[in-house]
Amino acid sequence: MRWESGKTRRQEDDSPWVDTHVHILPPRRMAGLVRWVKKFTPGFPVSEDITSDEILASIRDSDIPYFFNLVFPLWEEETEDLNRFNRDLCADIPEAIPFGSVHIETPDKGGETRRCIEEYGFMGMKLHPFAQRFPAFGPEMRPMFEVLNEHHRPFLVHTGFDVFYGMYMDLEEMEATVRDYPDMQLVAVHAVFPRFKLVHRLLAEYPNFWLDMTNSISCMRLYEDIKDNRDNLPPMATSLEMDDVRENYDDFFRLFEDFPERIMYGTDFPVGFGYHPALLDDLRFFGFSRDVEEQLLFKAVHNLLSRCGHPDTLASLEGI
């Protein structure tokens, strides 16, 4: 079942999994997120009333030793409160690695970013430009980029799935941002799905460019299941960009051959394509080598945090 928590380390030598994409939000925002997912996922079993404790219990049931907790304001006026929420929440959760966020209308983006990094101890910042309804790489965001570049910190940004969202991202601006802020580590969340040829080139050209394969692994497995039966597509598959996936198919596998040390694997938990055991099965469907699997599950995260000056964050994990 896709929606059952359970162990992901079933054998003693199974790799630990650092989940780089979790959303524990305030109750009102959590309920709104679940309601949104239910609009396009018939039978989605997660309750709108799911609590932080329930999310955390499932994460722990699935043997997740660390996770990135990601927030982002939909309105400017919730920015400071949302970042304080993440600070207070994660202060009591040793597994949590918090990220902050800003809104395009946040008056002092540099100041809020500095507060998140220097005062709250956050690892970096996150934007979801499609949900927040503003461009991620315009000049308005430069104050945030400058602080992240100064501190060598990561910027996680939603990329890809343009057809599903009915929106467009300027990928030339994204590349310019990677180039202009070489000490800021830019993590393309969802790996600009399905533009794998592009991200392969960016990984080759820019050492500060990284991928998080959240949802993209599951979508590629879905593609494998339905590519020969396009007249009977399941919910959501109509926006899978089948033709583009086919054109980028070989490049998907080249990513793991050439750059596994900069590719991570998050889940969007609890509103992704399933709970942790099912999403681990999606990864293993492709039969990657043990070394590649270890990179995706925890070693690439360690590489990222080490690049950001925090090599000891995951030091307790075996194999680091």
Q: Which residues fall in each region the model found?
A:
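Mid-to-C-terminal alpha-helical segments outside catalytic/metal-binding sites
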Residues: 1-20, 29-66, 115, 250-254, ...
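Active-site gating loops and adjacent loop-to-helix segments of metal-dependent hydrolytic enzymes
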Residues: 14, 23-51, 62-65, 206-210, ...
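Divalent metal-coordination and catalytic microenvironments
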Residues: 21, 67, 86, 98, ...
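Histidine-centered divalent metal-coordination motifs
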Residues: 21-27, 158, 190
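Alpha-helical scaffolding within the catalytic cores
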Residues: 50-56, 81-86, 109-112, 171-174, ...
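Active-site gating/metal-coordination segments in enzymes
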Residues: 66, 74-169, 218
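Short, electropositive alpha-helical surface patch
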Residues: 79-91, 182, 209-210, 279-287
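Catalytic pocket-lining loop regions of alpha/beta-barrel enzymes
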Residues: 123-124, 137-264, 318-320
